[in-house]
């Protein structure tokens, strides 16, 4: 029997809205807010004042487990390099910026010297201006060429919204420069009639990696004049290019560099990143080029008050009678409501599209009870909207018409939202880099700001709100990506060959794994070797071999039955869990029921309904070891890393009451299984170790299962992954290892580097896992430690005390981490000896 937990989209069922919370004793952190300073004379309340008002309700102050004060910082000015055109400097000054910050001037100097550079400074530190000054100067020079297009620049953003926002900024900044600067967006929303003008006349093209992969590079002859003059490539928010998506983007960039070379261009790459560990190395992996880093942030910053907020326990009980906390979704909706009533401009960042819609709906309902004019000032912003809906929301946000917004990470990435007072983050976003990026959206223009992290009821969030040093005393993570992943590299070699025949010198550009893959691609009759190089042999488009976001397949369209109206799309990889038959789907505040999921036609038919429940899919998994790459002894057991094959099937879904989260029932589903070949870390335990840990056969399955759930929950603290990027399986007797085994694997074909990171930091990772379980206040396990909302076995069996004893015994003989003591950016945890349980309440 295998117990498993699969990567999937968030399914944060709406928690208890009206149930009375059970107040519990949470001692106020020693570093809690000092006495409130006097409110400033301006109309904008101080962050401390806003937080005090939020905490004023019954039992609310106990929910704040820690408050961190980041003091204001003064800025350091410099002067622009004299090679920047005076007209550009004048345009910048006309925009109200008299002098650059020191990091802006330094980055511009590198760009003018022809050096690729990454600017890794904080949110709102002016990274855009750092690359725009040299880019606009070069474009203005090029506009004086006989054809008016002597220089061009390409801008890559991870989202359409960011590209559209940047175009507005560039157009405004460059207005005094006349027709010398011609910015244009080229993405899936660009009307067909405008595309030819962009190709022939625009000299600053803003797009995304998806369009570069599918639209621009395969049609490079039509872009020849643009590519021939390409001087700069700007890669904005480059820290988001991690995991499988980042690996794909790295190969798309290598294809771009190859075509530029054929047209005689050698563009300089200008990258903008949030504060990150080793930004130069990460940018080098992404581009394949040496990259200089500018990481000393010289911009000023207002005070940031950062509160950690843990929702209270309720009177309700979950699976197996476990105590249940109020959901982060419901708690965030309350906070957004209160902030809107206070007139505080706020954004609530939510992990899932569904969560964003739920928070918006709840906030609107509650605001209507206060003032009927307020619901219109709150909205949801997420991916999957139609282009016209997305643009309308962006206009409302910029105009100030919207006061509160529930947004997914589509808004996290640098869109210029001025005047925000507060940010509420519903659940840890997976990395410290993303956490600080979201928190930094408030307090622009130097004013003070409030950020609140609301903990979800899971092991990692619970650990973090009670261990603030893991957030505030640790550096941000290194970016993990693997361009040599064969599942990533192979389709890009095919795409490159379709663009221009691949030659032997090209292979160095694509990395050492390219030469090994070519014979396999020939055998598969995808490529054919001729004297001029390797050629693409098929009629279909090579660029369609892969979805660079790692989602696979074509999107599933969500269509309203009866009217035929297209509501939006969902990725094929998420369709089995998000739009299965019977699923509840939210769109723009309306609720729909999925009547049919047609996988062949990639369509989900829905009808509007108002069910009093939400739905959560459940799945089961089997795993087989294909190859063990590395293994090291852990006492009598082994820690291994290698290739596995995972078979997953969505088998049912739960219906939960909206108000209480109570499970109403489970409905079986008949969906086909899906197979994934990927990379995994796994560990085994021997009978002697089980005897030492007092693990008898009756509790073995529950102990392994509990350790697996908790270890998945804690891995994002050690690797730059999200919880749904990884999956796990625990087996009391696995047929390949012939021992009790726990697997944790990458949820992407070919792997994404997360399991490898887990192998490298295994001692620290499993020590933190043990501590998270042992320090939880519950008796037999709860969502804060060992229960998982996605468990295909209904969180049964689980044995909390057995998991602690098992991990204690395993760690007793654990060698130092192969990655070394300095590579893990997670907090130091106590020894896992029986005498040092990490908590006086340890079982």
Which residue ranges define each predicted feature?
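Extended Lys/Arg-rich polyanion-binding regions
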Residues: 448-451, 457-472, 482, 492-503, ...
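Short hydrophobic alpha-helical segments enriched in small aliphatic residues
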Residues: 12-13
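Short cysteine clusters
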Residues: 776, 781-785
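Helicase motor core with emphasis on the C-terminal RecA-like subdomain
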Residues: 55-95, 99-102, 106, 112-118, ...
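Short Fe-S-cluster ligation motifs
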Residues: 807-820
């Amino acid at each position: 029997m295998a117990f498993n937990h699969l990567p999937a989209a968030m399914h944060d069922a709406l928690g208890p809205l009206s149930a009375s919370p059970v107040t519990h004793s949470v001692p106020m952190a020693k570093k809690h807010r000092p006495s409130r300073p006097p409110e400033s004379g301006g109309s904008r309340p101080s962050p401390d004042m806003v937080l005090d008002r939020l905490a004023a309700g019954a039992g609310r102050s106990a929910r704040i487990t820690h408050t961190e004060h980041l003091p204001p910082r003064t800025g350091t000015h410099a002067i622009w390099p004299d090679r920047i055109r005076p007209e550009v400097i004048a345009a910048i000054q006309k925009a109200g910026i008299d002098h650059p910050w020191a990091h802006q001037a330094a980055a511009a100097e590198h760009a003018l010297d022809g050096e690729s550079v990454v600017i890794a400074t904080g949110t709102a530190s002016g990274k855009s201006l750092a690359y725009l000054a040299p880019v606009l100067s070069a474009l203005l020079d090029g506009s004086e060429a006989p054809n008016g297009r002597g220089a061009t620049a390409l801008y890559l953003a991870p989202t359409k919204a960011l590209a559209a926002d940047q175009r507005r900024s560039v157009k405004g900044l460059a207005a005094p420069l006349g027709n010398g600067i011609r910015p244009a967006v080229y993405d899936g929303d660009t009307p067909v009639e405008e595309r030819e003008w962009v190709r022939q006349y625009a000299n600053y093209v803003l797009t995304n990696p998806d369009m570069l992969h599918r639209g621009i590079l395969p049609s490079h002859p039509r872009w020849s004049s643009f590519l021939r003059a390409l001087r700069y490539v700007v890669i904005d928010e480059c820290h988001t290019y991690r995991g499988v998506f980042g690996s794909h983007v790295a190969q798309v960039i290598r294809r771009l560099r190859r075509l530029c070379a054929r047209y005689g261009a050698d563009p300089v790459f200008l990258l903008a990143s949030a504060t990150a560990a080793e930004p130069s190395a990460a940018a080098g992996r992404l581009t394949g080029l040496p990259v200089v880093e500018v990481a000393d942030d010289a911009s000023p910053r207002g005070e940031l008050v950062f509160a950690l907020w843990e929702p209270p326990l309720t009177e309700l009980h979950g699976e197996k009678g476990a105590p249940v906390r109020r959901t982060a979704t419901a708690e965030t909706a309350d906070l957004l409501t209160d902030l809107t009533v206070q007139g505080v401009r706020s954004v609530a960042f939510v992990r899932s599209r569904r969560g964003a819609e739920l928070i918006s709906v709840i906030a609107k309902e509650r605001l209507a009870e206060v003032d009927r004019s307020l619901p219109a000032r709150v909205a949801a912003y997420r991916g999957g909207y139609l282009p016209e809906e997305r643009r309308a929301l962006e206009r409302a946000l910029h105009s100030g018409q919207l006061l509160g917004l529930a947004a997914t990470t589509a808004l996290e990435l640098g869109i210029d939202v001025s005047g925000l007072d507060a940010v509420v983050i519903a659940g840890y976003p997976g990395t410290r880099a993303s956490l600080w990026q979201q928190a930094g959206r408030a307090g622009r223009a130097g004013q003070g700001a409030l950020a609140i992290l609301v903990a979800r009821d899971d092991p990692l969030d619970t650990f973090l709100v009670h261990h603030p040093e893991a957030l505030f005393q640790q550096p941000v993570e290194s970016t993990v990506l693997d361009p040599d992943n064969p599942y990533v590299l192979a389709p890009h070699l095919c795409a490159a060959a379709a663009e221009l025949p691949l030659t032997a010198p090209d292979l160095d550009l694509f990395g050492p794994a390219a030469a090994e893959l070519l014979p396999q691609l020939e055998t598969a009759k995808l490529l054919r070797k001729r004297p001029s190089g390797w050629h693409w042999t098929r009629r279909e488009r090579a660029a369609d071999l892969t979805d660079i976001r790692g989602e696979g397949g074509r999107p599933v369209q969500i269509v309203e039955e009866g009217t035929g109206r297209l509501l939006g799309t969902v990725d094929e990889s998420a369709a089995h869990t998000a739009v299965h038959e019977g699923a509840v789907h939210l769109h723009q505040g309306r609720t729909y029921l999925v009547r049919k999921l047609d996988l062949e036609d990639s369509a989900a038919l829905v009808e509007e309904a108002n069910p009093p429940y939400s739905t959560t899919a459940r799945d089961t998994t089997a795993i087989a070891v294909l190859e063990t790459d590395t293994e090291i002894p852990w006492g009598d057991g082994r820690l291994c890393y290698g290739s596995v094959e995972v078979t997953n099937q969505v088998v049912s879904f739960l219906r939960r009451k909206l108000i209480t989260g109570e499970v109403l029932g489970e409905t079986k589903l008949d969906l086909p299984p899906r197979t994934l070949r990927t990379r995994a870390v796994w560990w085994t335990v021997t009978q002697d170790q089980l005897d030492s840990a007092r693990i008898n056969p009756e509790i073995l399955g529950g102990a392994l299962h509990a350790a697996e759930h908790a270890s998945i929950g804690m891995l994002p603290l050690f690797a730059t992954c999200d919880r749904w990027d990884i999956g796990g399986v625990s087996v009391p007797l696995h047929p390949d290892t012939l021992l009790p085994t726990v697997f944790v694997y990458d949820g992407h074909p070919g792997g994404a580097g997360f399991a490898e990171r887990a192998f490298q930091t295994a001692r620290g990772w499993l020590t933190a896992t043990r501590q998270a379980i042992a320090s939880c206040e519950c008796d037999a396990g709860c969502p804060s430690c060992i229960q998982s909302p996605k468990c295909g076995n209904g969180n049964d069996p689980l044995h909390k005390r057995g998991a602690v004893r098992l991990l204690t015994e395993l760690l007793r003989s654990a060698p130092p981490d192969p990655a070394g003591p300095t590579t893990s950016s997670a907090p130091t945890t106590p020894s896992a000896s029986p005498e040092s349980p990490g908590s006086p309440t340890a079982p």
